[in-house]
């Protein structure tokens, strides 16, 4: 191993005039070495670097294109959603207005129905009162008639004696006989 190290050290001491070798002077060799390395890198790496940059550029452009398409789709969906929202808001407003109208209509219908029911109940009450009045009047008439009839019968019974009774019967028989002759 010592031989290998000695050979590298001996290479470092070679004279630089007219021969190829390593220059160990860092300040003198850096710009030259750097320019050689850069030249080799530029010459050989230019194609690779160009391909890498082109690939990267294509990926970025594809990403931007996809993003633009997604953005366009999102804007389109947003507009559709806004249109649906406006439509739903209009329908909700219509339902609200119709709901209030229907509530007012139902309220009026209920009031009218209640009024009609009260009117019918009032008519029924009046009919019932009239019926009860007629019934009471008829009962009073019947009682008055019965009392008058009983009074008349009582008066007739008290006034009639046998003689008057026989004369009344004879008069009635005579009237029937006369009526029979007229009809024959």
From Swiss-Prot:
<comment type="function">
    <text>F(1)F(0) ATP synthase produces ATP from ADP in the presence of a proton or sodium gradient. F-type ATPases consist of two structural domains, F(1) containing the extramembraneous catalytic core and F(0) containing the membrane proton channel, linked together by a central stalk and a peripheral stalk. During catalysis, ATP synthesis in the catalytic domain of F(1) is coupled via a rotary mechanism of the central stalk subunits to proton translocation.</text>
</comment>
<comment type="subunit">
    <text>F-type ATPases have 2 components, F(1) - the catalytic core - and F(0) - the membrane proton channel. F(1) has five subunits: alpha(3), beta(3), gamma(1), delta(1), epsilon(1). F(0) has four main subunits: a(1), b(1), b'(1) and c(10-14). The alpha and beta chains form an alternating ring which encloses part of the gamma chain. F(1) is attached to F(0) by a central stalk formed by the gamma and epsilon chains, while a peripheral stalk is formed by the delta, b and b' chains.</text>
</comment>
<comment type="similarity">
    <text>Belongs to the ATPase B chain family.</text>
</comment>
<keyword id="KW-0150">Chloroplast</keyword>
<dbReference type="GO" id="GO:0046933">
    <property type="term" value="F:proton-transporting ATP synthase activity, rotational mechanism"/>
</dbReference>
<keyword id="KW-0793">Thylakoid</keyword>
<dbReference type="Pfam" id="PF00430">
    <property type="entry name" value="ATP-synt_B"/>
</dbReference>
<dbReference type="InterPro" id="IPR002146">
    <property type="entry name" value="ATP_synth_b/b'su_bac/chlpt"/>
</dbReference>
<keyword id="KW-0472">Membrane</keyword>
<feature type="transmembrane region" description="Helical">
    <location>
        <begin position="27"/>
        <end position="49"/>
    </location>
</feature>
<keyword id="KW-0934">Plastid</keyword>
<keyword id="KW-0812">Transmembrane</keyword>
<keyword id="KW-0066">ATP synthesis</keyword>
<keyword id="KW-0813">Transport</keyword>
<dbReference type="GO" id="GO:0045259">
    <property type="term" value="C:proton-transporting ATP synthase complex"/>
</dbReference>
<keyword id="KW-0406">Ion transport</keyword>
<keyword id="KW-1133">Transmembrane helix</keyword>
<protein>
    <recommendedName>
        <fullName>ATP synthase subunit b, chloroplastic</fullName>
    </recommendedName>
</protein>
<keyword id="KW-0138">CF(0)</keyword>
<dbReference type="GO" id="GO:0009535">
    <property type="term" value="C:chloroplast thylakoid membrane"/>
</dbReference>
<comment type="function">
    <text>Component of the F(0) channel, it forms part of the peripheral stalk, linking F(1) to F(0).</text>
</comment>
<keyword id="KW-0375">Hydrogen ion transport</keyword>
């Amino acid at each position: 191993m010592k031989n290998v190290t000695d050979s590298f050290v001996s290479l470092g001491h070679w004279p630089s005039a007219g021969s190829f070798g390593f220059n160990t002077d860092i300040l003198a060799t850096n710009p030259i070495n750097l320019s050689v390395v850069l030249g080799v890198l530029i010459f050989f790496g230019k194609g690779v670097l160009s391909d890498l940059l082109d690939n990267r550029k294509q990926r970025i452009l594809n990403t931007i294109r996809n993003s633009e398409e997604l953005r366009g789709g999102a804007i389109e969906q947003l507009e559709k959603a806004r249109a649906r929202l406006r439509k739903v808001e209009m329908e909700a407003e219509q339902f609200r207005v119709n709901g209030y109208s229907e509530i007012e209509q139902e309220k009026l219908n209920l009031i009218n129905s209640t009024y009609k029911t009260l009117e019918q109940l009032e008519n029924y009450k009046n009919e019932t009162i009239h019926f009860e009045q007629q019934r009471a009047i008829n009962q009073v008439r019947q009682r008055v008639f019965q009392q008058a009839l009983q009074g008349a019968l009582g008066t007739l019974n008290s006034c009639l004696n046998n003689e008057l009774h026989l004369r009344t019967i004879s008069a009635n028989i005579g009237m029937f006989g006369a009526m029979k002759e007229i009809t024959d």
